[in-house]
Design a protein with these regions (language model features):
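PRPP/pyrophosphate-binding module of the type I phosphoribosyltransferase fold
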Residues: 99-158
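Short glycine-rich phosphate-binding loop at a beta-alpha junction
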Residues: 49-56
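Short, ordered loop/turn segments at secondary-structure junctions
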Residues: 57, 79-81, 153-154
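Active-site-facing substrate-recognition patch
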Residues: 1-49
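Gly/Ser/Thr-rich loops at beta-strand to alpha-helix junctions
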Residues: 56-61, 127
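Short Gly/Thr/Asp-enriched flexible loops that form oxyanion-binding sites at enzyme active sites
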Residues: 61-70, 135
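Short, glycine/charge-rich flexible loops or terminal/linker lids adjacent to PRPP-binding catalytic cores
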Residues: 72-118
Length: 158
């Protein structure tokens, strides 16, 4: 299965009336396309990772599916101030997102993911600031980032 075939299927599904960016949730409603996306994004990481990590919220949809495909655990990276722990129990990192807003990601210090091999997954990357923040957060737990997996489509061609 070629990734270009999957990209062409995605292009055929994405609504043409989006403003600014595409709503990738639309492609997740197509089971066969969603399954193909998960398989393509998982291919290079079989037996190479201990966990898949993804930022809240849409990244979790793709990340959990890829974790299941790879037979590994999932790390849900939370948006700031969402974890039910005292501040001293949380590791966080701050970043400026694609729209210029200050944001943060968090994970519990008691997380069992220290010193593990991790694949980071998200639905799309615009500026890379969100991915960089997830990398920084996991590196605070001494994790090895094995790779990044995301849906890559040139918006100009859709």
């Amino acid at each position: 299965m070629e990734s270009t075939d999957v990209i062409n299927e995605i292009r055929g599904i994405l609504p043409r009336n989006s403003i600014g960016k595409y709503d990738l949730l639309t492609i997740f409603t197509h089971k066969t396309v969603f399954d193909k996306i998960v398989k393509v994004l998982s291919l290079d990481f079989q037996n190479k990772v201990d966990y898949v990590a993804a930022p809240e919220a849409i990244g979790w949809i793709l990340g959990t599916a890829i974790a299941k495909e790879l037979g590994v655990g999932f790390i849900g990276v939370r948006k700031g101030d969402k974890l039910p722990y005292a501040k001293e129990e949380i590791i966080s990192t701050h970043f400026t997102d694609y729209s210029g807003q200050d944001k943060s990601f968090e994970i519990s210090k008691s997380s069992i993911v220290r010193n593990k091999r991790v694949l980071i997954v998200d639905d799309w990357i615009e500026t890379g600031s969100q991915m960089k923040a997830v990398i920084a957060l996991l590196e605070k737990l001494d994790c090895s980032i094995i790779g990044l997996a995301t849906i890559g489509i040139d918006i100009n061609e859709v």
